[in-house]
């Protein structure tokens, strides 16, 4: 189990949203590069970056902040938000991003995921965000009629490196991740699952470690480490004990 610290970018700053609502944002740091370096210093092994403005606009919006992050760390990075075409993927990989996350475009155009995996082997992750089990897209503003499991199954065999599963109702709410839904998704597919949304305590991490054998390989944390509810170094130490 790998603990993955998150940096969510809005207007060039590190923010956290509640349940994906852009108007419910809290700025934690106006220097994303410094924040990235701090998470690496505390032992972060991978950094998760989201271009929130990009997710809503459908195109990259925080390029200078993303460049600053990449220059500030030596650990691998993964980035999502507004990635809708091959040219954007190429641009981010050239910048030094390790893996890109396809979200809305994966639901709207599954063939794009297949094409991206063929062109950039090992570099593509699919982000599936769900509300009450149903996939939500366009920065979570639109809930579709397809379940998370149905969508994830479409990518089996494409070469997707991982599925990041976010339960929107838990995100930023500090109520614990949806263990049951995360486990069910991981058991239903043959792609590794990274949990996201709601992590609030070391007990939550223990609960995720307990379902690791189902195919849950990591967890993304944002608000919990920014607010101090979880100490990142302690959380990483806990997972390393289990390895």
Swiss-Prot record:
**Where does it localize?**
Cytoplasm
Q: In which pathway does it act?
A: Amino-acid biosynthesis; L-histidine biosynthesis; L-histidine from 5-phospho-alpha-D-ribose 1-diphosphate: step 4/9
What terms describe the molecular function in GO for this protein? Answer: 1-(5-phosphoribosyl)-5-[(5-phosphoribosylamino)methylideneamino]imidazole-4-carboxamide isomerase activity
Q: Which reaction does it catalyse?
A: 1-(5-phospho-beta-D-ribosyl)-5-[(5-phospho-beta-D-ribosylamino)methylideneamino]imidazole-4-carboxamide = 5-[(5-phospho-1-deoxy-D-ribulos-1-ylimino)methylamino]-1-(5-phospho-beta-D-ribosyl)imidazole-4-carboxamide
Keywords carried by this UniProt record? Amino-acid biosynthesis, Cytoplasm, Histidine biosynthesis, Isomerase
Look at the named UniProt entry and state the broad enzyme category this protein falls under.
Answer: isomerase
What is this protein's name? Answer: 1-(5-phosphoribosyl)-5-[(5-phosphoribosylamino)methylideneamino] imidazole-4-carboxamide isomerase
Q: What's an example GO BP annotation here?
A: L-histidine biosynthetic process
Question: Can the keyword Cytoplasm be found in this entry's annotation?
Answer: yes
Q: Which family does it belong to?
A: Belongs to the HisA/HisF family.
**One Pfam entry name:** His_biosynth
Q: What GO CC annotations are associated with the protein?
A: cytoplasm
Identify the EC number(s): 5.3.1.16
Which residues does UniProt mark as catalytic? 8, 129
Query: What InterPro entries does the record tag this protein with?
Result: Aldolase_TIM, His_biosynth, HisA_bact_arch, Isoase_HisA-like, Isoase_HisA-like_bact, RibuloseP-bd_barrel
């Amino acid at each position: 189990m790998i603990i993955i610290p998150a940096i969510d970018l809005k207007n060039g700053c590190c923010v956290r949203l509640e349940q994906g609502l852009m108007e419910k944002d809290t700025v934690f740091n106006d220097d994303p590069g410094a924040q990235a370096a701090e998470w690496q210093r505390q032992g972060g092994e991978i950094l998760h970056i989201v271009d929130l403005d990009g997710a809503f606009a459908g195109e990259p919006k925080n390029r200078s902040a993303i460049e600053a992050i990449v220059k500030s760390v030596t650990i691998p990075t993964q980035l999502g938000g507004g990635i809708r075409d091959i040219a954007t993927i190429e641009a981010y990989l050239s910048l030094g991003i390790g893996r890109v996350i396809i979200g809305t475009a994966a639901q709207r155009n599954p063939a794009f995921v297949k094409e991206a995996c063929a062109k950039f082997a090992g570099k593509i992750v699919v982000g599936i965000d769900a509300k009450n089990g149903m996939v939500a897209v366009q920065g979570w503003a639109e809930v579709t009629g397809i379940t998370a499991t149905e969508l994830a199954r479409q990518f089996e065999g494409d070469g997707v490196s991982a599925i990041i599963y976010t339960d929107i109702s838990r995100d930023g709410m500090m109520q614990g991740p949806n263990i049951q839904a995360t486990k069910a998704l991981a058991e239903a597919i043959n792609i590794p699952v990274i949990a996201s949304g709601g992590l609030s305590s070391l007990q939550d991490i223990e609960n995720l470690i307990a379902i690791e054998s189902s195919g849950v390989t990591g967890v993304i944390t944002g608000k919990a480490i920014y607010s101090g509810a979880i100490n990142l170094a302690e959380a990483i130490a806990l997972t390393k004990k289990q390895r």
